[in-house]
Each structure stands twice: as C-alpha cells, then as structure tokens.
C-alpha cells in the first residue's frame, strides 16, 4: 500500500509541476494558447509570479511549433483600432506578478508549423534576464 501511495504522490507532483514552470523564484502559471492552423499565428497567455526580492525581465520566448515567438502588447489607439507592438522587455517587479492575457501582453507565435487544436500541448521556453530559460508546457484552449 505504501508503494502505491508513494507512486501516486510522485505522479501527482509530476503532473502539477508540468503545468507550470518554476526557477529561482520565478513561477509561470496557467499557460494556454489559442487554437490555430499551420501557417497562421496564435498567441500564448500566462501569469508570471516573481517571488524574489529583485525585479526580473522577460526578454524573449521560443517554441518549436512556430517559426518565431515574440512578446507583444495589444492596445487601442486614439482612433479605436487595436494595434500590436513588439516588446523587447517586460518587467516583473519584485514580489509581484504580471498577467499575459487577451487584449494586452501576450507571446505571439508567428507562422505555426502545425495545427494547434484544443487539447494539444506543446513546450515554450521563456527567456529571463536573471533566471535564464524556463520551459513550460502550454495547453491549447478555446478562449472564453
């Protein structure tokens, strides 16, 4: 019985930690992406929690599912048109979190190399100034 319990607990830990990334006080939570077709673009959304006493910077991202990955900020201009601007640095203050969400910051997956269907998962590596690279698992979901 103890072997079954230990195996179950180990499996549970693996499942929980595969859904988020954590390195040196930086936790990446709730990562998801929109469905998309090969050749189109998609976006990744997530929350980054900086548990350290120093500010951190997200400086890049990459994934094998797309030709490129860029950090973008969506915003509404004075004419009411949505625009996107590439971001070279996103600051996560010490002991704080930022959310990459629809209509704001996000990771743009440029030119998908394959279809992304609801339920699929794929890795994305986030590049941080201090923590280095953190690879997370992203689930494809329909936006609410």
Model-derived regions: residue spans:
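Compact, glycine-rich, soluble single-domain proteins
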Residues: 23-144
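C-terminal motif of bacterial Sec signal peptides marking the signal peptidase cleavage site
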Residues: 16-19
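Residue-level signal for mature regions of secreted extracellular proteins and peptides
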Residues: 10-13
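Bacterial N-terminal signal peptides that target proteins for export
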Residues: 1-8
């Amino acid at each position: 019985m103890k072997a079954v319990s230990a195996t179950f607990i180990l499996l549970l830990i693996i499942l929980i930690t595969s859904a988020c990334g954590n390195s040196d006080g930086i936790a990446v939570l709730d990562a998801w992406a929109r469905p998309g077709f090969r050749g189109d673009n998609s976006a990744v959304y997530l929350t980054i929690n900086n548990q350290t006493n120093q500010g951190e910077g997200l400086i890049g991202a990459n994934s094998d599912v797309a030709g490129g990955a860029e950090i973008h900020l969506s915003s509404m201009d004075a004419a009411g048109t949505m625009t996107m601007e590439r971001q070279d640095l996103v600051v996560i203050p010490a002991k704080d979190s930022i959310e990459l969400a629809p209509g704001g910051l996000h990771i743009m997956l440029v030119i998908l190399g394959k279809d992304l269907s609801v339920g699929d998962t794929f890795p994305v590596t986030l590049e941080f100034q201090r923590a280095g690279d953190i690879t997370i698992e992203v689930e494809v979901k329909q936006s609410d």
